Amino acid sequence: MREKKDALVVTFAETTQAMAVETYCHANGLPGRIIPVPRAVTAGCGLAWKAAPADETALTAAFLMAGLDWENMVVLKI
C-alpha cells in the first residue's frame, strides 16, 4: 500500500469554481492539480485542488488577487 503524505486540499462549492482555479493555475504556472474530493472532506462539488502544503500561502494570495472563490483549504494525509 502506498504511503500517505500531507497534501493541501482546496474544496469548492461549485464545479465552475474548480474549473476557474484549474485554468488560472495552469495559465500562471501555479502548482497543483484537480482531484476528486477525498472522503475525509465534504464539499459542495466533487472536485478539489491538490498541492503541497508549502504552497498554501502562495496559492491563497494568488486566488485572492485573481478574485477566485473556494470553500475550504485543509491539509490532509492522502
Map each language-model feature to its residues.
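C-terminal structural segments of small proteins and small subunits
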Residues: K50-I78
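A generic "binding-loop/recognition-motif" signal
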Residues: T15, V37, D55
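Short amphipathic alpha-helix segments
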Residues: E14-R33
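Short glycine-/aliphatic-rich beta-strand segments at the starts of folded cytosolic domains
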Residues: R2-T11
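A short linear hydrophobic-aromatic micro-motif
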Residues: P31-V37, E71-N72
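Small/polar loops that bind or transfer phosphate-bearing groups
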Residues: V10-A13, A51
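Short, charge-patterned binding micro-sites
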Residues: R39-L47
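Short, flexible, solvent-exposed loop/turn segments with mixed acidic/basic and small polar residues
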Residues: M1-R2, I35-A40
